[in-house]
Structure formats: C-alpha cells, structure tokens
Amino acid sequence: MQHNAGFTRDDVVMAALEIGVDRFTMGKVARLLGVSAVDLGRSVSSRDDLLVACLERVSADITLPPAGLSWQKYLRQLADSLWDVLDANPGLDHILIDLAWAYVPFMSVAKRAHSALVSGGLRSEDAYLALSCTLSTVLTSHRQAA
C-alpha cells in the first residue's frame, strides 16, 4: 500500500461520503485514500467520529429555501431540498432513520427552518409538527424509493 502522508480530516470525510455514510468502513476509507487504517487515526478517532464529521458536512451543505415564503411554499421547497440531499448522499436516509443520535448535527438547520416556518405564518408548535412530519415523510419515502 502506498503511504499518503498528506491527507487531511476533510479528505477522510470526503472519502467516507464517496463510499456512502451507511457503507463506509475505516478499511474502505483507508484504501480509497491509499493509506493504512491506522493512519486514519491521525484525523479521526473512530468510525463514529467519522460518521459525525460526515453528518456535520452534509448538514453544512444543506440549502434551505429562501426566507419570506409562506409556510406552505417553504415546506414544499424544503421537502424537495431534503430529497436532493438524500439523493446526493446514498445511505443518509438509513442513518437518519436507524441511529437515534444522527439528527443532532442537523439541529441548527432545523432551527433555521423552524424560524422560517414561524415567519411564514405558523405557530411555533405547529412549525415543529410540520417539520417533523415533513422530515419523516421525506426520509421514509426516499428509503422506500431507493
């Protein structure tokens, strides 16, 4: 195996995302980067550490609908945006459904979406319910369609 000492944590995250968040192993990531699994320890402490980093990356890349929309239009565009994120990240639907803690890196996105729904005319508690229903529907539909 060729030793690639120049890789970064970002390289490790991108390799894991390329493999798929539900399918990557430390060995597969190391092979893709041309390093040993032990070398990955310089950038990530465990598979869970890498999974959290992947989820944080995906969360940071989510494009929410523009502010100022009615709550109905916002939810429709949000559902489309979430579907696109799931399409771009194979296995993400499985991870978000199967791992109880996997939603945590997405909380700041959810808070921004909640604020937009309230600004669009929903009461706060209704906005939480609408987000929960929309996310559940998109996740389960995407998982079934895959």
Language-model segment annotations:
Residues 11-19, 57, 61-64, 74, ...:
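Solvent-exposed, amphipathic alpha-helical segments
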Residues 109-146:
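Hydrophobic alpha-helical bundle segments that form small-molecule/ligand-binding pockets
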Residues 1-28, 32-35, 56:
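Short, amphipathic alpha-helix enriched in basic
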